[in-house]
């Protein structure tokens, strides 16, 4: 399914993004994996780690600095992409509680940007990660992820 495909991973330098990228490189012969994140240092660190772990495959990785809150930048990253794995989120419960505007911008507006870019760029499939905290949410993180889930479902 993923052989010879281009995959974009939002939050690609996070714990899920790194594990997913390793799994894909271990099991598929992808055309390209775009690691999309806003943290330049984490991208640099991940690239160096993957040069050691996957010296013959690191050329398939592209490190794209950007934020899911920036629709124009994200659309640029989506050119030629077959699949998006959306793992970017503001996910620490206390950080969301103390920074509600940032949580909404990233987790809800970011989801809307993923959907719009995927539709505009003819992306074949989007897989959006969620959390158990979106079921009967009791905090802002759960609430923003519930809204994000509803947006992705409505876009089907």
Which ranges hold each PLM region?
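Conserved glycine-rich Rossmann-like NAD(P)H-binding loop of the short-chain dehydrogenase/reductase
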Residues: 25, 29-45
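Adenine-nucleotide cofactor-binding loop residues
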Residues: 41, 69, 91
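Conserved Rossmann-fold cofactor-binding substructure of NAD(P)-dependent oxidoreductases
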Residues: 56, 62-83
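Residues in the short beta-alpha loop(s) of Rossmann-like NAD(P)-binding domains
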Residues: 39, 49, 132
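Conserved Rossmann-fold NAD(P)-dependent oxidoreductase catalytic core, especially the SDR/UDP-sugar
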Residues: 83-86, 90-150, 154-156
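N-terminal Rossmann NAD(P)H-binding glycine-rich loop of SDR-like oxidoreductase domains
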Residues: 5-27
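Short, conserved SAM-binding/catalytic segment
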Residues: 46-58
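Conserved residues in the N-terminal Rossmann fold of short-chain dehydrogenase/reductase
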Residues: 37, 64-65, 105
């Amino acid at each position: 399914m993923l052989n010879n495909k281009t995959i974009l991973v939002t939050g690609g330098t996070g714990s899920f993004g790194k594990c997913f990228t390793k799994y894909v490189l271990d099991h598929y012969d992808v055309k390209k994996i775009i690691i999309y994140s806003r943290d330049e240092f984490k991208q640099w660190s991940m690239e160096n780690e993957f040069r050691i772990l996957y010296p013959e495959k690191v050329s398939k990785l592209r490190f794209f600095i950007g934020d899911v809150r920036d629709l124009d930048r994200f659309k640029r990253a989506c050119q030629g992409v077959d699949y998006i794995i959306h793992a970017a989120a503001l996910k620490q419960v206390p950080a969301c509680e103390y920074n509600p505007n940032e949580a909404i911008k990233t987790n809800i507006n970011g989801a809307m940007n993923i959907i719009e870019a995927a539709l505009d760029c003819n992306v074949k499939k989007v897989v959006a990660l969620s959390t158990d905290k979106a079921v009967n949410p009791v905090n802002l993180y759960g609430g923003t992820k519930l809204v994000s889930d509803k947006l992705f479902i409505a876009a089907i």
